[in-house]
Amino acid sequence: METQDSAYPWHDWNARITHECYEPNATARILDEKERILGIVNNYAAISFNFGATLLSWLAASAPETYQAILEADRLSVDRYSGHGCAIAQAYNHIILPLASDRDKRTQVRWGARDFELRFGRKPEGMWLPETAVDVDSLEALAEEGIAYTILEPHQAARWRELGEEEWQPANGHLDPTRPYLCRLPSGRGISIFFYDGPISRAVAFEQLLARGENLAHRLLGAFNDVREHTQLVNIATDGETYGHHHRFGEMALAYALQLIETTPGVRLTNYGQFLAQHPPAHEVEIVERTAWSCSHGVERWRSDCGCNTGAGQGWNQQWRTPLRDALDWLRDRACVIFEREGARVLRDPWAAREDFIDVILDRSSESVSRFLERHALAGAEVTTVLELLEMQRHALLMYTSCGWFFNDVSGIETVQILHYAGRVIQLAERVSHETLEPELLERLAPAYSNLPDRGTARRIYEREVIPARLDLARVAAHYAVLSLFESFDDMARVYCYEVTRRDFDVRRAGRARLAISSVEVRSLITHETAEFELAALHLGETELAGGVRRARGGADYDRVREELTRKMQPGGIPAVIRLLDAHFGETPLSVRSLFRDEQRRILHELIVATLEEAESTFRQLHERYDPLLRLHTRLGIPVPKVLQTAAEFDLNRQICRLLGHEPPPLMDLEAQLRQAGDEGVTLDESTTMAFGAAIERASERFRERPDDLDRLQSLETLVTIARDARLSLDLRRAQNRYYRMRAAVRPAIEASGNGEQWLSLFDSLGRKLTVAPAAAIPV
């Protein structure tokens, strides 16, 4: 995932929402009246929850502690709730199932169930329907896969009756949501449906019910009705992001509410699986087909300008939804024709292979691919062709991810992302079939107009953002060539989902100029496509680059070109080197744009840092010379001249960041710099504050690794003290988590030893400064 600027200061929206929601719910705080941490709990272990498969894949790679906490919560809930885990599966990549083809419905359900099983170590009992979008065929797909239940909104019930009775009762959106219902299906199968409490769910999402945990608890408890004679289940359903992302500290309100409910006589927490096992349906229901919880017009939000949006600008419309879906439907159908035709040449049963391809998606190892090919490939089938066909189908599913239609404009990042998926379908379909499909897709995207005139149409967005970002092996080789000028690689390097093997490498310098010449093999870890390239890249300083990439010619030709370049690479020979590069590598010229987006930013940042380092001494001299004048201005409350203020801010922030980068930081020097910043009225910028938080996190991890090391404890305690004294607003969540766990696991042994008085004093002081309540204050 590349940088998403709108998620700043985080790298992307997954990272931001993980920080604001997914991670906090795994370590939710319960506070006392002094806002000290009384307890840290994993909300996921108490409530039913679901994560999409693609999000879990990202969490496993990018936020492993949070990912493991989610898996552990399900394991704990299996013990807590009589063998029924809290985790619920989801249709694979959150497509609107009623708008999908029958085949895609079943693949989405099967892939979602299989992904769940491999992650959580058990088969799913329940499955969340994306946006609760439902029709009978979707329920059939769930039942075929052995799913026992799903959850819907009350208005999605058409009518209900008690089992064994003849007469149906119209639901009208008001059926009893405190019991499960059986939905009989045309196949003879059945599936249980829970209907969540709509008013309370809406109050949580939109009416500030999460402002206080006791308010949420009282509202939930108030939903029980003594008139009902059956065992009642009060259940609500909301977007998970509600708890922390949409409503800050919502995870704390939830944690406190759960604690209050657990201590209420006559009431206990449960999950859907346990409740269903203990209280099977005594009533049946029929659904209103093609409905969803987030559209009052059925499922039109994902294919037409129905009026549902997220607060569009005045005069905006969503007429772009229809041509977008029509274009993708056309592409899906063309991809299916190609898949069946070309797949029949390499696969025993192409569609059966697609159903099982989830095993390869979850495990890309050579062994996994070999097992898959043994089951499905015809003798002599070309591996890359097989994988490209199946990847084409995977992206044809991904391009229907529901958020692509949910929001206000076709230019939003969610819609642009599904266009990227469509672009990958085009790339793979054209490669395996040798047909030309992209011009037709562009024509079909042209009627999808953005509400922002400068963004044009979906066609223009595709041309501007999808086509230039398209990857192939040559683009990876170009990226590698440029990056090799700035950093060192081993002979085998991983570049995202590609593997680059270096056959030959030579670097020459002439003054500031640097020339890298290489012969490499690039291999896709996804499709196993492989090609060899020859690279030559010349860095002339700052962002000036020359060179290029060409398909390998090998042998004497490569040796001759390398010899010519290295011979000319000397002072005064740079113009000749550039002419040689143009002559031999001019077809694919290199520039900073050859880098993938994240590396573009990183390299440019490094170049800027290098430039700033040259200017740093000038700023420091200016700052040091006028330091007494700055202090006097600050003491007298007189505004500091802009040039001096800028010099002071630049110099002090740079020095503090540099000190924080040491392991461990030199604490006396750090205190002195912070005092100087205070005396001169200098505010620490965001990067310095984040560096301070990162230093505390690293110090807490060093202490966790060696809890008996008094120096490490002292360093951490002092660092936190310095931050508090400087009144820095820091995120100390991870340091608090480690402290909380260590107090239970380490402190008792130190105390029992009888010779840890200094350690205990420092440790307890650290707890106070991390705002953790004393051990005696924490309820057992």
Question: Each predicted region: which residue ranges?
Answer:
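Short linear interaction motifs
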Residues: 27-32, 378-390, 498-504, 653-659, ...
